[in-house]
Amino acid sequence: MRNKQAQWAVLKRLLSYLKPYSLLTFLALAFLLATTVIKSVIPLVASHFIDQFLNNLNQLAVTVLLAYYGLYILQTIVQYVGNLLFARVSYSIVRDIRRDAFANMEKLGMSYFDKTPAGSIVSRLTNDTETISDMFSGILSSFISAVFIFVTTLYTMLVLDYRLTALVLLFLPLIFLLVNLYRKKSIKVIEKTRSLLSDINSKLAENIEGIRIIQAFNQEKRLQEEFDEINQEHLVYANRSVALDSLFLRPAMSLLKLLGYAVLMAYFGYRGLYLGITAGTMYAFIQYINRLFDPLIEVTQNFSTLQTSMVSAGRVFALIDESNYEPVQENGQFKIQEGNIRFEHVSFSYDGEHQILDDISFTVNKGETIAFVGHTGSGKSSIINVLMRFYEFQSGRVLLDGVDIREYSQEELRKNIGLVLQDPFLYHGTIKSNIAMYQDISDDQVKAAAEFVDADSFIQDLPLGYDAPVSERGSSFSTGQRQLLAFARTVASQPKILILDEATANIDSETEALVQNSLAKMRQGRTTIAIAHRLSTIQDANCIYVLDKGRIIESGTHEELLALGGTYYKMYSLQAGALS
């Protein structure tokens, strides 16, 4: 954003969003031009009154005065309508930009979200787009208005007296020099200020998400200090921006305007009578200097907001242009019929350097359950990420019903895989909408899904039943209740493949019995892959795979692995000892 070419590219792209609103923009510009013309005529009427009627008041003088005030009223009305039209165009464009940014964000792969703080993304979709709105609603209209006013005022001044106009024009190079100097000085400061604001949002989001852990480990003071450090740095750069505005904007421009008055008055006093310059003409010129300088002062003041808008637009367009998408699917016509899964020598790395999965091979068919166990970082969840196509694997093959997983459309793949996570996510809405997940299913189907996983009993105990409100992340429900709702959501979607990513890890022993009963029913007739921390929950699996550093080091049934006396045996013994 620091070179002119990049800034022009951003501006050109911003202006391209005007295309769908060409008619509305044309009307706004027409009202803006009408306002400018009226503003240019008003000093002429005043000049005529001073020269012709100041010492000779009559009926015509009253008519001229009424015309003078009538023009002011008309200017106010026309300007108001023009501002409304510009505001409508502005908010429509911001809606479109925000929609494009959100649409692209939804298509991005998990790797983008792994490396990009949530607060930074939120900042781009909220703060930065609002700044763009300021540009279209205020800055763009003021820039165009300044051009209209400059041209019409300059023409009128030349018609009135070319000599006085020449004197005024001597100040224009100084004005443009001042504006250019401000632009160069401010861009770096503004970029840094916006970046720090994004950091503040990221830090806030992180602290709000982890407030329980922060308080549990007495980390309030440390995180307060970290936040204060970023906040203080933002204050420093914000003050620098204000200092630049205070120096280069209104004070300097106002000084030039006053200097213009002085030169004009001196010239009028020295040569005015000799050259036949009337008092009315002089009054008109003073008004025109105001009309010439005031828009330029406003434009210069808006340069700060313009620079901020350009930086913000660059950040939003970076999100719109982000191409770190989910792995590519062929959008083929294949349909998942059974849900049989086969991994053939699959290797995977998140960063292309450190191998997370190394030569993984296994098979699981409809009606079977397999489980993956291992220490943290062994690669269990990475297998799920590969199967869900959240990430692209580097080598090997993944087959579904004998067809390469890449040959299925993303929609076909996702609708046939039911994913239940360790920490179930509930959306703001109702219990019904969370189970249905906005699919076109009936209330009876929602209730049947809840009954199937034994969630109906606690739902019916709620005052509003299935219409009971769900707060953000479902914080008003217990962990077990949230998990049962997640199970009901999965059953309602009727997937052929079920993935359980430590689905019972956070549930107490009493609730676990209820959940295990629900899981047993869910697994019937489905291909099931379970990632387990509690080994007691996967003892009935058809095959258990033990992972270590991305490789399968043991496999077999629960009894076979215990008899082997290897890693699984040690893990099971440790858990059994802890329980006893």
Task: State what each model feature region is.
Residues A262, V328-Q329, F334-S580:
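ABC-type nucleotide-binding domain
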Residues V10, L18, F86, V94, ...:
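Juxtamembrane loop-to-helix connectors within ABC transporter transmembrane domains
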